[in-house]
UniProtKB/Swiss-Prot annotation:
Probable component of the gamma-secretase complex, a complex composed of a presenilin homodimer (PSEN1 or PSEN2), nicastrin (NCSTN), APH1 (APH1A or APH1B) and PEN2. Such minimal complex is sufficient for secretase activity, although other components may exist. Interacts with PSEN1 and PSEN2. Its main location: membrane. GO terms for cellular component: endoplasmic reticulum; gamma-secretase complex; Golgi membrane; plasma membrane; synapse. It is a multi-pass membrane protein. The keyword Transmembrane applies. This is Gamma-secretase subunit APH-1B. PANTHER family: GAMMA-SECRETASE SUBUNIT APH-1 (PTHR12889). The lineage of its organism: Eukaryota, Metazoa, Chordata, Craniata, Vertebrata. InterPro entries: Aph-1 (IPR009294). Keywords: Membrane, Notch signaling pathway, Transmembrane, Transmembrane helix. Belongs to the APH-1 family. One of its GO terms (biological process) is membrane protein ectodomain proteolysis. It comes from Mus musculus (Mouse).
Amino acid sequence: MTAAVFFGCAFIAFGPALALYVFTIATDPLRVIFLIAGAFFWLVSLLLSSVFWFLVRVITDNRDGPVQNYLLIFGVLLSVCIQELFRLAYYKLLKKASEGLKSINPEETAPSMRLLAYVSGLGFGIMSGVFSFVNTLSNSLGPGTVGIHGDSPQFFLNSAFMTLVVIMLHVFWGVVFFDGCEKNKWYTLLTVLLTHLVVSTQTFLSPYYEVNLVTAYIIMVLMGIWAFYVAGGSCRSLKLCLLCQDKDFLLYNQRSR
């Protein structure tokens, strides 16, 4: 039973991301490099957040009680802000690299920013999902019984679906965020930051899984629709894609912008 829970939750959480990687990234070495670079940027943001958290804990002398609750909230908010700052830094790096490539070899076609946004977002999402869910997933192999102290017996399942939504949100956030940077629409960046904060702070409502998941999935659907149109999608292109009649749909042959 524990093995079934482990593999079931693992495929729920990471199955869609794995499919995206296999079908849209794995065949192109350059995309793999950008994916790894995006994951690395997320790791550095986590490291910086951890350093701040450690320093604050030392300053407060590891006090218990309400102080720790406030520190936890502060830590989550700070971590989200740092992640978005590193997303911006990664965009700046990719933009400079793209411009440098064009200046060196004008005939070389650089990857479009839309494609880079998708790949970097998936890198952010996969690394975020791994760090947030792997420890929980390892506990599903046992020993122990979920819910023995009144916790929900659906804890692992809820965590898997929450990890899935966060991974997909990072993909959508990446596409929308990069588009906002390209068009200097700063309200777009603010929207990405605010929705990221909303999804992250929902973890403080952990006993109320229904509220968490419903809210997170509503945000995911809305961000997904936004990212779809930002990436150049339309109702017509979606119809052609679903009917397998569009071989040049969105990501495969994006022209450089």
